[in-house]
């Protein structure tokens, strides 16, 4: 499974004709894409009032990853490891990464923070 980050969705939604859009369509067609709940919320909050219902229906077809108590414990441990390495990450990225780790999924993002997270062994990246 591939957890698709907000950065990929935004690029795809803004520029329908792109290599990211083609790759995302292929992942969706193969049922290989999943949606971390923070990504879903970011996408819905960024959509216009008119586009939001259609986007919500489209996103509802995807498996959505929700945090558990274990997710929060994993993030708490990562904060210590990252801090010890002189790294800091946003809450949303940590949550997306932890949800991917727990499900054995790869993360596809255009955000360099996930590359840094990968360097610490927190996530494995999908590279199309």
PLM-predicted stretches and their roles:
Residues 1, 97, 101-128:
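Acidic, PIN/NYN-like endoribonuclease modules and their adjacent C-terminal/linker elements
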Residues 1-35, 44-57:
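Short, well-structured N-terminal submotif of metal-dependent ribonuclease cores
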Residues 4, 35-36, 67, 109:
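A conserved hydrophobic position in a structured secondary element of the catalytic/binding core
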Residues 6, 37, 91-94:
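Conserved glycosyltransferase catalytic-site signature
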Residues 34, 65, 123-126:
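General small-molecule cofactor/ligand-binding pocket signal
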Residues 50-54, 82-83, 124-128:
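Short, hinge-like loop/turn segments at secondary-structure boundaries
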Residues 63-110:
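Active-site neighborhoods of divalent-metal-dependent phosphate/nucleic-acid chemistry enzymes
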């Amino acid at each position: 499974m591939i957890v698709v980050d907000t950065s990929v969705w935004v690029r795809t939604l803004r520029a329908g004709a792109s290599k990211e859009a083609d790759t995302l369509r292929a992942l969706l067609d193969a049922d290989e894409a999943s949606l971390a709940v923070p990504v879903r919320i970011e996408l819905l909050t960024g959509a216009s009032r008119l586009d939001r219902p259609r986007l919500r229906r489209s996103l509802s077809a995807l498996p959505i990853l929700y945090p558990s108590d274990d997710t929060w414990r994993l993030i708490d441990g990562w904060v210590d490891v990252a801090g010890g390495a002189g790294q800091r990450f946003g809450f949303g990225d940590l949550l997306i990464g932890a949800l991917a780790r727990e499900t054995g999924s790869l993360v596809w993002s255009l955000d360099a923070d996930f590359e840094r997270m990968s360097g610490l062994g927190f996530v494995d990246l999908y590279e199309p």
